[in-house]
Amino acid sequence: MKKETQNLQCIPLVISVLSLFGVSSARKPPYLCNRVCGGISIPFPFGIGGKECYLNPWYEVVCNTTTSVPFLSRINRELVNIYLPDPTEYYSNGVVHIKGPVTSSGCSTGTSQPLTPQPLNVAGQGSPYFLTDKNLLMAVGCNVKAVMMDVKSQIIGCESSCDERNSSSQVVRNKICSGNKCCQTRIPEGQPQVIGVNIEIPENKNTTEGGCKVAFLTSNKYSSLNVTEPEEFHSDGYAVVELGWYFDTSDSRVLSPIGCMNVSDASQDGGYGSETICVCSYGYFSGFSYRSCYCNSMGYAGNPFLPGGCVDIDECKLEIGRKRCKDQSCVNKPGWFTCEPKKPGQIKPVFQGVLIGSALLLFAFGIFGLYKFIKKQRRSSRMRVFFRRNGGMLLKQQLARKEGNVEMSKIFSSNELEKATDNFNTNRVLGQGGQGTVYKGMLVDGRIVAVKRSKAMDEDKVEEFINEVVVLAQINHRNIVKLLGCCLETEVPVLVYEFVPNGDLCKRLRDECDDYIMTWEVRLHIAIEIAGALSYLHSAASFPIYHRDIKTTNILLDEKYQVKVSDFGTSRSVTIDQTHLTTQVAGTFGYVDPEYFQSSKFTDKSDVYSFGVVLVELITGKNPSSRVQSEENRGFAAHFVAAVKENRFLDIVDERIKDECNLDQVMAVAKLAKRCLNRKGKKRPNMREVSVELERIRSSSYKSEIHNDDDDDDDDDDEDDQAMELNIEETWDVGMTAPASMFNNGSPASDVEPLVPLRTW
């Protein structure tokens, strides 16, 4: 039965909504209108904009777009605030606060004539406004009498004076205005709604006596400290007035309640409960019948003048629900709530939330841990595959056979090198070339190393690569960069060398610095150390090793400016009984032995030729990578040889050393370089002979005794020699089968990559 009653109640609700808002398909619902102006909320039945936004013109609010100040258009007063009916806040009716007029006299121009503004007019056919009983008539100043106008059959007013005798009694009675400098009085209820305020001068008082005087209606409660200064009220120009508002029941659109219960009906039925959403009270004012509706304060809040405007309050989330239920379960219901005993085993919501959150957190950690484990397993599997593919097992076997050499190369793990290079951070890059990148790193023992990460390696060269690593790891010479080890757990092998801090010889020859000047003595010392290192590689190592890429960019200088021969990327070891090595041509333009270029047979004399070019660089200070232009269009080496033969030696000596050098020594080294550059490898000295000869040249007792037995032969073969030089230059791009990056006519790759081999094994 109750359910049927509720269904029947929905019918008048729908009808009232349609009648109240004049709903049609073409009209916008009032809850979609603008509801704020100047920070003031404008709830329905008030509204801004079109007719669908407010109930009728009496409720229209005009929002000044420039100042964002709201005005009640029908009474032309600035709006301060709007309150919906709320019995809990002592607003049985709706309330609006507006700015009312202030009447003044003698405040600005010095005249005693009162300045009386337009009276406050809230009357009119259908006006829902009236002055509430919270408004008072106040007069502030000395010798001022405030009188309300337009109040028929009554004289309402008050009079203030400046009698100091009343000040003590004023404080005792704790009244704001008791006649001393200000006065106040209540206004009658149920009076017409056009009310003005005038100022009169009391009898037996001078019109100019007392200074500024003001009178006004207000609902504000002022303290006794600030109410006796009339100038402040005059400067403000307004006083806040409270108006009550209601629905006129003669309006056809509000004949049916919006699903609300009448208070009188509720009294007859013994009151209303939580099932009642909103309540309407009825009354009369000055002959008018009105209705005032509000949401049931027992469990609802909102705007009762909108469909569905009164919404249920969830008391379980408020202090009232928590206090009343305490250890019981709070259950929210429409309009109210109940406290029910907890079920056996029921967990508190907070504790339950902690358990669920902890479980989810553990689950997330488990998933993350599983992901990391799988990722680690996959990475380990890949590293094992790379290790086998890159010849790791073969290298282990080779190292096992070399037990006597404790300083053999070490096999680094990928984790070690990632940690050493900060995961191969780009900020650690020392150089970058066509075949790989070199990073500066620091091992766990504090050693600074150069880590070369190659770009590619042929799979059919794995065994050869491992053999070369083992051989190079055995090199132990103070003027040769030490190969510390390698890592085979990456896609391509990573090589680890000792770090050499002071760059390469080529850069030092081009750009001398103040802290280390490349004098002739320094250059000769460097040449001797290079020759000693190459002599060691060719004859003193376990197996003869041919460097195959001797050039100034591969000659590094350590912190003491001692020579370190580097870049063994194209090096080859040979057995004792081998006299040459047949390989794919590799090298750098300007340094390659012409005989090797034609035959592809590399011998120890090929390194001698390249060293001869380095000697020419030390003497001339010029770079062989750029061609020396001459009338005969000779190459760098041929130009030097011709200058020595034609006694133009002083023309090619570096200007920076010409004045301070021992010319006998320079001439001797030049002749030695000429022998190293002989087009016939058999006529070149070996590196041991070159090393001994350079030591003799440096000796203070040395005089030029360089053997030049082959000069005549060279003279006989000048034309062939020149033709050979030209042939090399003309066929360079075709004949060389090594990568193009190795034959850079500009700055060699090693200029920026001193430790990176030009080609990976």
UniProtKB/Swiss-Prot annotation:
Highest taxon in the source lineage: Eukaryota
Binding annotation for ATP: L430, G431, Q432, G433, G434, Q435, G436, T437, V438, K452
Glycosylation (residues): N64, N166, N206, N226, N262
Residues annotated as transmembrane: 350-370
Ranges of Acidic residues composition bias in the record: 708-732
Tissue: Expressed in the whole plant. Detected in root-shoot junctions and lateral root initiation sites.
GO terms of biological process kind: cell surface receptor signaling pathway
Database matches in InterPro entries: EGF_Ca-bd_CS, Kinase-like_dom_sf, Prot_kinase_dom, Ser-Thr/Tyr_kinase_cat_dom, Ser/Thr_kinase_AS, WAK, WAK-like, WAK_GUB
Compartments where located: Membrane
Domain Protein kinase: 424-697
Side of membrane Cytoplasmic, spans: 371-761
Signal peptide range in chain numbering: 1-26
EC number: 2.7.11.-
Location of Phosphothreonine modifications: T583, T588
Extracellular compartment residues: 27-349
One GO location term (cellular component): membrane
Membrane topology, record value: Single-pass type I membrane protein
Region listing for Disordered, in residue ranges: 701-761
Family: Belongs to the protein kinase superfamily. Ser/Thr protein kinase family.
Described purpose of this protein according to its UniProt entry: Serine/threonine-protein kinase that may function as a signaling receptor of extracellular matrix component. Plays a role in plant mineral nutrients response.
Name assigned to this protein: Wall-associated receptor kinase-like 4
Organism: Arabidopsis thaliana (Mouse-ear cress)
